[in-house]
Amino acid sequence: MERSYDIVIIGAGAAGLTAAQYGARANLKTLVIEQTANGGQCLQIEGLENYPGFPDPIDGYDFTERFERQARQFGADFAIATVSRLEKTGDRFALETSEGPVDASAVILATGAKHRHLGVPGENELGGRGVSYCATCDGPFFRNRRILVVGGGDAACDEASFLAKLSDKVTLVHRRDRFRAQPAVAQRVLDNPNISVRFNTVVREIHAVKNPMGIEQVGAVTLEDVQSGAQQRVDMDAVFVFVGSIPQTSLVPTVAKDEAGYIVTDQQMETEIPGLFAVGDVRSTPFRQLVVAAGEGAVAAHRATHHIRVLEGNVYQEVPA
């Protein structure tokens, strides 16, 4: 990893990888920093069905690999590292990473969001021992077992449908009286004989049992009917939680955010700090989809290119947004 770039992109999901492609294609020295594996939450997708140009379902790994390959072909650099500090000094941004310092003229935040927890007893204690936030990662461990899915959005319904391929004992609970998921996604769940749906229901506690090796793992849950208040203990072997996300904004504590903590930008994806952009799941937007995130990445890279050209004194005629 070199030390000086035109654009540094933090995060390698659909938004970050698209920004990398457009930045590198503009002949700008572009670096993508990802702390784990490139792809972000795309990697959890078992079958992507609604991305334009892909009439047949494609899994998240293959989808990500195509994005990354295209960005590399245009010359983008990639690094596996953690960014611990980001600050602006003059016209440049300084970043401290686990692989050393880096500076850039523009930074695109594509840091995404992490899974929101239920906050109930037993959840943290049994993480990795039956409590999971990724069905494609951990679902195969619970083939033909009793599985509980929590949530009512697209993610919960998609993951429940995936888990129903592994077990005919899947229960989906949602605190409201109807799904928030897109109608087609929700209907797939309602039509699946392997999925039992319980509306107006929340999880109050996750209980442990000891396996033959003496290790505690998920054994049951306490469910509560939000209308009657009645509680019921139900035997379960796994709990998969999909109840929303928390934007990853710790690098920019003073940047403007909406009431939910997502970064606020203008239509060009730029924050109130010139040269600092936010795209994808970390950004305040009414509609979170991969195709939207990719579009945001392209817009941010285009605007970052203009920002850099201004700094260089090489301004081109802008096309109105």
Region spans (language model):
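A Rossmann-like FAD-binding core segment of flavoenzymes
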Residues: 71-97, 101-103, 165-267, 306-321
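Beta1-alpha1 glycine-rich phosphate/pyrophosphate-binding loop at the start
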Residues: 5-74, 145, 157-183
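Glycine/Thr-rich phosphate-binding loops of Rossmann-like dinucleotide-binding domains
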Residues: 117-118, 157-158, 180, 231, ...
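FAD-site-proximal beta/loop scaffold in flavoenzymes
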Residues: 119, 124-141, 241-292, 296, ...
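Residue-level detector of alpha-helix initiation sites
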Residues: 13-14, 37, 113-115, 154-155, ...
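Phosphate-coordination loops involved in phosphoryl transfer and adenosine-cofactor binding
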Residues: 4-6, 80, 99, 143-145, ...
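Glycine/small-residue-rich loop that forms an oxyanion/phosphate-binding "nest" at active or ligand-binding sites
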Residues: 78-140
